[in-house]
Amino acid sequence: MDRGIYLSNRLTFQVFLKEVWKHLRLPPPTPIQLDIADYIGDPQKSPRRAIVEAFRGVGKSYITSAYVCYRLLLNPDIKCLVVSASKVRADDFSTFTQRLIKEMPILEELIPREGQRDSKISFDVGPTKAAHAPSVKSIGITGQLSGSRADLIIADDIEIPSNSQTQMMREKLGESIKEFDAVLSPGGQVIFLGTPQCEQTIYDILPSRGYEMRIWPARFPLEAQRDKYLGRISPFINEMVDKAGMNPGEPTDPLRFSEEDLIERELSYGKSGFALQFMLDTSLSDMDRYPLKISDLIVMDLNTDTAPETLVFQRAPYLQNDEIPMVGLHGDKWYRPLDIGGKWIPYEGSVLAVDPSGRGRDETSWCVVKMLGGNLFLVAQGGIQGGYSDEVMG
């Protein structure tokens, strides 16, 4: 294909991706891969702050590495910063990008010239003007981001189990991500690539910071599961079910993973791990990992002496109680009763439970639970500081 066609700025990234796949001797890009390319591949229409959440093995990094080449082909003066959880991972991304430039005939004019930077961690492209920042640079998320400048930031798998196990780790990671705003040039683009590693993943926080998330799960979600994704599933996935007649539960990309392959991986990963890594469903992971949930409780006004004979419970969206602050895990909700039936009659029993604190900073907690008809009613609770002193226990 003549290089002049590329430089006309009329060639879509999807077509360029097909040329890259052909050079790598890979099968043609799958519909899912082309949909991801369409989401990130138009510098004018694509989100300036995008999150690509797609199942493991779909080729997110390969696609985005080709996108870096595509952007450099259209404008050799842009600067790209590749950030990953580990420096090695970021270097692998930039090395692959560099090899594409040196091996594909259509990219030969981007090959670094004599006197330009030419290493796997930092390199220039041939036509670029002299600048402090290299055309492509790789760095770890804990490295020195300050001082860098970039028109395109690729955050490739910045969340891994070793840096997201605790709330403190996730907060530290979130602060590191804020540095992107200081690095990004005006009008620049940030693309996050990854899969959630925990139920309180940093990716779920980023939309509140102005990022747009799009999700490509490994299976078409059931109708009841769609709400859990908060409208972030790719429209292409939804259209395949609503208009093309695909059945929920079938593989979204059978050319990559067949149903048999997904079943084997689900058995190997476990339901919770598969939900995170392949279905990108953090709420399902919470339900599997934590048997006691706030959504198991019924929130209602109670009397200290009597209670209704029957209560009907249902987790329906219109029964959610949003007036009470949610202090549970992401995706959990408070629910009102669906129906209150029968007469209000006296409780059958009452228990006062006390959990004394140690000598640390925790509190002595207490609660009063009353019983009626197989239901337990929490009518009072509280906490007192002071350990187990006479004043507290009295």
Task: State the predicted function of each range.
Residues 1-48:
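N-terminal accessory segments
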Residues 47-66:
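Walker A/P-loop
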Residues 64-75:
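Walker A/P-loop NTP-binding motif
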Residues 83-145:
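Conserved nucleotide-state-sensing and coupling region of NTP-binding domains
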Residues 121-178:
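Conserved RecA-like ASCE ATPase "motif II neighborhood" in helicase/translocase motors
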Residues 151, 193, 199-204, 256, ...:
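RNase H-like, metal-dependent nuclease domains and their acidic two-metal-ion catalytic environment used
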Residues 202-290:
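Conserved P-loop NTPase catalytic core
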